[in-house]
Amino acid sequence: MTESFAQLFEESLKNIKTRPGSIIQGTVVAITKDTILVDAKLKSESKIPIDQFKNSQGELEVKVGDQIDVALDAIEDGFGETLLSREKAKRHEAWLTLEQAYKDSKTVVGLINGKVKGGFTVELEDIRAFLPGSLVDIRPVRETMHLEGKELEFKVIKLDQKRNNVVVSRRAVIESEYNAERNLLLETLQEGLIVSGIVKNLTDYGAFVDLGGVDGLLHITDMAWKRVKHPSEIVNIGDEVKIKILKFDREKIRVSLGLKQLSDDPWTKISERYPEKTKITGRVTNLTDYGCFVEIEEGVEGLVHVSEMDWTNKNIHPSKMVQVNSVVKVMILDIDEERRRISLGLKQCKNNPWMEFSKKYNKGSHVVGKIKSITDFGIFIGLEGSIDGLVHLSDISWNISGEESVKKYKKGEEVLAVVLQVDPDRERISLGIKQLQEDPFAKYVSSHKKGSLVSGTIKKIDNNVIVVSLSEHIDGLIKFLNISDEIMNVHDNKPWNKAKIGEIVEVKLNSIDKKERIIYLSILEKQELKISNDIKKNNSHKQEIDKDKNFSNAMTEAFKAAKNVD
């Protein structure tokens, strides 16, 4: 009976493939902690490690009574036991699936689980495949972090089971999907349409958004109404965004997208909301060498030029006045809605030191300050409020030239001056030092009128004029034509020879040039004046004599008439 059973069993083995590697079917008859007992109707039941029946999450995939495929390793291992493998059977199934997919050009599902030279490794159930870097996507992809760990579809483009070589492509799947989606999308896309998409890539100038078969560019300037330094401030890879189609070139299949266009333009009617000279608070968003940008509301920024930051420090660097994210008070100076530019002022929200000075000091007021600098055109004096006043060269001395008088002063020296003029709008203060004293020229001409006779001392003799000192620091000029014969020798090569330096002369004050501060004198006209005065005097005397004579004659005639009557 036993031999008969053995013979029958041997005969049954002949009817099945019993060489190692064959795939046969078995039944799960028992499950223990470490093994699973499988009956494949061979000489004995086989114990297979339980790990071969678990999935990638560590979950057991079979139960007692399940029919499963296993690979035959050996009918008898020398100890009377049959060796089976569930793992090899699964690999065999996977290869069959890959072969069918390769034959039918269908996709398979796998996971990108590592990076190797030239590409990535992909786990296709129990088979490891190679994914070239150029076939990850339609566009080059440097990082696959956002793809790793996700179930993705691939196409098998090369298969060699003997060499255990499988090459897959994700790009082929995307292209196939894109072609179908693109054709459908291209029929519906139009400018002004609001669509949804997935951010797939970021650059310095914007973000590429997958609209479902067609990529569109969301430029950085169309992300928000406010200033955006980098696209990552607004969107990130993988974000689903709602955007507006701004431009669509159907021939070149180029799509320009806009995000900010979904909200109202904050620049609309901005001049009505912020009239000039309005004072508001804002946040500093950026610093440059020429100023700082201040956000006065969401999406609206204005520039505070460096010249509008401080009343006195015109070239101060913005970083010494404000910092990024600082909240500051500014004034609206100008709005150009067309060019979307706003000029703001920081200093205008502080007291104007020039205006404060003009309120405190009037023309003629005395001020004290230290000399800050001396230039070719005058002296700058530091005044309260950290402002400067200028003493022009012409306002240093009444009698000495500015070039000479300025040499008497040194930087840092404290001086007294008179306020001549204050112009807050032009930020200028004119000061004078000579005005601390009375003008000797004005004093002299006020007491010596034109045409009067004055005396002076000859100070200098030139070929054309004689300089006469009339008073301390007051000189007069006698021109050649106004020199009398008394001091002139026409036969000499010199125009005169009798005039001597130090000689006191009496002259006529001929004319006064107040602008040039020159007094013109004349000796000739002085003599003419004397002659005229003498003639007038003689004429007056003669008239008196004639008057007396006429009176005497009248009396004589009267006596004669009286005598004849008698």
Curated annotation (Swiss-Prot):
- Which cellular components does GO assign to this protein? cytosolic small ribosomal subunit
GO terms (molecular function) for this protein are: mRNA binding; structural constituent of ribosome
Q: Which InterPro entries match?
A: NA-bd_OB-fold, Ribos_protein_bS1-like, Ribosomal_bS1, Ribosomal_protein_S1-like, S1_domain
What is one GO biological process annotated to this record? Answer: translation
Tell me which CDD domains the record gives: S1_RPS1_repeat_ec1_hs1, S1_RPS1_repeat_ec2_hs2, S1_RPS1_repeat_ec3, S1_RPS1_repeat_ec4
The cross-references to Pfam families, in alphabetical order and at most eight, read: S1
Could you list this entry's UniProt keywords, alphabetically sorted: Repeat, Ribonucleoprotein, Ribosomal protein, RNA-binding
Q: What is the official name of this protein in its record? A: Small ribosomal subunit protein bS1
- Organism whose genome encodes this protein: Buchnera aphidicola subsp. Baizongia pistaciae (strain Bp)
Quote the gene name from the UniProt entry: rpsA
